[in-house]
Amino acid sequence: MGLKQLHPPKWADRFLRWYCHPDLIEEIQGDVYEIFYRKAAVNKSAPRVQFVWNVLRFFRIRNIKKGKKNHNSSNVNFSMYKSYFIAGLRNITRNATSSAINIIGLAIALGCGVTIFLLLDSYYNRDKFHEKGDRIYLLMNKMKSADEVENWARSPYLLGPSLRDDHNAIESVVRIQRDRLSIRHGDVVFSEPVWFVDKEFFNAFSYPLLHGQSNALYDPTSIVLTEDMAIKYFGRTDVINEQLSVKFPREEKITFKVGAVLKRIPDQSSMSISFLLPIQTWEDHVDAARNIQWRTWAGSTFVLFNEGHKPSDVTVVVDKYIKVQQAANDKFQIQSIEWIPIDQVGKRSYDIKYSLSWSNLPAAMIGIGIIAVLLVLLACFNYMNVAVASVSTRLKEIGIRKVIGGGRTEIVQQFLIENTVMCGVALIAGTLIAYIFLLPAFNTLFPIHVPFHFSSNTATFAFFGGILLSVALISGAYPAFYVSSFSPVKILRGKEKFGSKSLLSKIMLTVQFIISFTTIVACLVFINSSHHFEQKDWGYDHDQQLFTVVKNLEQYNALKDLVAQNKNVISYAGSESHVGFAEHSTTVSVGQDQVNVVRLAVGFNYLQTMNLQLVQGRDFDPNIESDKKESVIINEAFVRKMGWKEPLGKSFEFDNITWYVIGVAKNFHFKEFYYTIEPVMMHIGPEEKFRYLVVKAEAGAVNQVSDFLKKSWSSVAPDDPYEGFFQDEVFQQFFNSNRSNNKIMYFLSAVALTLACMGLYGLVSYNL
């Protein structure tokens, strides 16, 4: 190919002519062509690449073709906005006092807003990390009581598999049974929460694995544990095929090999996992599973539907099995079933009995969100008042701008851009405050961990963009539009006076203090309500009691005999469940009504040991034979529910036995104080089922008795960890959460008061 026949790439030449400015195209095109032919004389292949490179190299802002329309206007606008931006930065340094007040106030308020938004974002996006989450549902049962319907996470053990086998809409069923077992590795032994789950657990849920395979639960000899548990027992995480010994309630010790290690459970998970075992293990080694039937309950049942299917597809089949369950269980009868999406379980768990998840009350979340909005509004009004007060120092600037041709629109734009710059600085500072101080403090106060990231990029941009624009407009709109309306003649003649004495300024100042007052009062009302819980009567004296968990009758008798010899012990008693720590719910028949009650199977001295007060009747008497078989003590809530005026001697049916009321105990709190006290029945239970030994110590000797129990335990059950608790600590998690809420409210009150004071200082500083 000759030199004259060699041409540069046509597409590159067209691209050059497309972007290049008409005034420069002749010069630039001539240069690249000259270079092309000069190189072509030496090398016939390289010049084409060189030509493309030169075309791209000249693709610079100054060489790009400008639009014919509004050419001058775009340059002017760009320069104008740039000058406004620079002026905004200069204004921050020039007016140090007002800028500091505004930025600090906004930063603190926005820092609180960022922290609370992170909390709300985490709360309302719980459990959304599961890849198949849109197809996973909790099978929640609505249980019929005498005059109400309760939501239960428990469901019939056979219901899930029956639905799966009877309908092709269901891909997987995952049942979860919970227990607390002793787990040992060498000399390291702890009592741990263990979940028994169906082998399809990892097919439904997307908990990430650190080591091992997701089919580990298909092996009945495998155990799955979390990263934290691996470090706790082995000091490392790569523990595949290592062995752990698990002690079951029947005193069976079974060795399992580690089949998989879970990464730390995601912060967005509402369920807390420590150990997983195949549910077949529960069926083989736990007493409750000896005779599985439709009366047997699963702790929770989750259903994964096939793609394209939904819960309504199995309505007919569900109704069929509800009738089967009702025929099999006359005590606990399902009225209906509600399918709860997995991402709603954590938010509704406060209203679901026996839920696997922990949830805060919606009112608390809404209240915190409202207070955050009030704080941001307070900071905005604080900014407006200080900005209005500082206008007097910029009146001449505004007048001169108008005289030399500046229109109202340009002045509005100037003030809004300056305000946006300041709000942007405040938002950056507030985000740093949230990251460094507020969020870490929040995470130390509550049992949940809120990460410093949003659920999605969309949420991130929406929040920061939305709050910046909202705060900038709310705080800057009034000063910008009102100031731009000033007459330049009056300004330059000194007749335009504007400051905090104007009517609108007074109105805004009033609104600011109303918001401050409302925020502080709301916080104080919340705090007062929390203090009410702190001072609330438990229904019994709880200062000198402690209790120990026992696994069997041998442990109970051995520890009881040792306790009986301790001079610091006033009384002791055994129980199958215990006030404030473990509850057994059941249904009793009162005439034609089925009533859900809390059942306490106790020893003869239980009421005396726990200081439970009788308001009517008598305590259990070991010398009266009927007290061992058919006598029962109920609480005031039971009496009120049944409407009995004379409860003594009344009877009801439970477990095919007619029980007669011999006493009425004063109401006592079995659960956290925001729960209504439920009806309770107490009866003498068989000692072989006792799982708690409750001890009442002499005044001031409770710690000595606790030490005695710890030392005695090593001789009673050397293979089991000691589990002893003080009775006044059974609601400790509730009180800790309550006190943490108080600290947040105290802090928010202080922030509101600080913002109000800063605004007042800013106003005063401009009027002295």
Q: Where do the PLM segments sit?
A:
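Mid-to-C-terminal secondary-structure elements
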Residues: 198-210, 221-363, 561-737
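Short, strongly hydrophobic transmembrane alpha-helices
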Residues: 27, 91-124, 502-529, 540, ...
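Short juxtamembrane loops and helix-capping segments at transmembrane helix boundaries
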Residues: 124-133, 144, 274-287, 349-356, ...
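Small-residue-rich transmembrane alpha-helices
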Residues: 115-118, 338, 420-486, 518, ...
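Membrane-proximal extracellular/periplasmic loop immediately following the first transmembrane helix
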Residues: 26, 116-182, 294-302, 306, ...
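Intracellular coupling helices
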Residues: 85, 89-97, 101, 105, ...
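Conserved transmembrane alpha-helices of multi-pass membrane proteins
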Residues: 360-364, 448-474, 499-511, 548, ...
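Negatively charged linear elements and acidic catalytic determinants
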Residues: 1-93
